[in-house]
Every structure is written in structure tokens, then in C-alpha cells.
Amino acid sequence: MNIGVWLSYDGTRYDGWQKQGNTDRTIQGKLEAVLEKLEGSTVEVHGSGRTDAGVHAEGQVANFHLAKSMDPDGIMRYMNRYLPEDIAVTRACVMQERFHSRLNAVRKTYRYQIETAPKKNVFERCYYYGLGQELDVGKMEQAAAILSLIHI
């Protein structure tokens, strides 16, 4: 059975989405470890995209196949019980067998946040880039005009 899950995570403590041989601090690795305990065998989790180290996600879709037939809500409760507190499954459902979260993705939204205050907010430092000065909107508009002419 093909299960789709919607995820939110604070990526501060992680080395990105993709499982890596030199670290167990990845989102994919944490998900697969929990699911392997549930399934009793290896489970490969496919994400709709890969985030870099320290990057957060809200509403990221992933999918995985289980040999056992299980209730999606039960899977979600199990995962949330055993995942670290900075990773949450917010929704789970049975998907069509051919569904693949990356190949069937229709949209991704990225949000970049810049803090322009001269002093950093220590409680939000992981969620903003601390520039420490006002943005020069005129220069940004000039750069955007140049970039709009470049075709890659």
C-alpha cells in the first residue's frame, strides 16, 4: 500500500532531507528508521523535494510503500509518537499505487525571510537571515530587471 504523508519540520538540527552514509541526522533517515520499526523491514521514503542542511519545511509531501495494510491515521499517530519533536506528520492517506511525491509534484513554494533589525532576535534566529540593515529596494529592482533578461 502506498501511503502519502504531509510533513512539517524544523531543519535546524538536520543535515538536510536526503539520507547520507556519514550521518543519521537527516529527515529521510529519521522517517525511514521509524517506519522500519513499524513495518519490520526496510522502507524507502520519497520526498517531493530535498531540503539543505538547516532548512525547514511546512506541508512537504512524501510517500512510501508498506507491505502491511494499515490505517493511515494509525500510521500518522505511530510516526508522531516515535519521531523527534521537531518533525511532525500532519496528514496521512492512502495514495494511488503509482503516486510518487517527487514525480507527481505540481508546485513548490519557497519562502526566504530576512531580518533587517540591527539586533538579532535570539528566539527567531533559526528562521530568518539576519542582515542587520535595511534592504536597498532600488538595487534589488535593478538586479531583478537584469535577472529577468537572463535565460538559462
Model-predicted regions and their roles:
Residues 1-151:
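Structured-RNA-binding interfaces characteristic of tRNA pseudouridine synthases
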